Design a protein with these regions (language model features):
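A cross-family phosphate/adenosyl-ligand binding-site feature
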Residues: 1-85, 91-151
């Protein structure tokens, strides 16, 4: 699922369109399709990751305001007690942001800001990105070959 705002961000920051990501996707859902499978608790999945997660999306999830498929799927993920990982990237954070993130954390949501780790001495943006992807995958219980653990 990619929101219209997500599509703009993808293009502005990466020069990519949603079609460019389809090689890694099985299904593409429209953000306005509230009747899609991820909107139902009976749809089996391991969990949900929102990357990047805007503070608007954080606010919507916190308040249960499910006006698009991402917000509804996150709401269902929380109610079904499945893993929800939000890769937030706002900086600096306001008190409102922190309150919303705290509230979600209290619900068991994993807040994972894409913080650069220097202990592995990254030499490229690709290595920094790989480390962040590794952290996300690790939280989902999945292995990522480019993730260097602390030794």
């Amino acid at each position: 699922m990619i929101t219209s705002a997500g599509e703009k961000t993808l293009w502005q920051e990466c020069g990519l369109r949603p079609e460019d990501l389809m090689q890694w996707a099985d299904i593409k859902y429209d953000e306005n399709d509230i009747g899609a499978a991820p909107a139902s608790g009976s749809w089996k999945n391991t969990g949900m990751i929102v990357v990047p997660c805007s503070m608007k999306t954080v606010a919507g999830i916190t308040s249960g305001y499910s006006d698009n498929l991402i917000l509804r799927a996150a709401d269902v993920t929380i109610k079904e007690k499945r893993k929800l990982i939000l890769v937030t990237r706002e900086c600096p954070l306001s008190t409102i942001h922190l309150r919303n993130l705290h509230e979600l954390s209290q619900m068991g949501v994993i807040i994972l800001p894409p913080v650069v780790s220097y202990y592995n001495h990254p030499e490229s943006i690709s290595e920094v990105t790989g480390h962040i992807v590794g952290k996300i995958m690790d939280c989902m219980g999945m292995e990522y070959q480019h993730f260097k653990r602390w030794e």
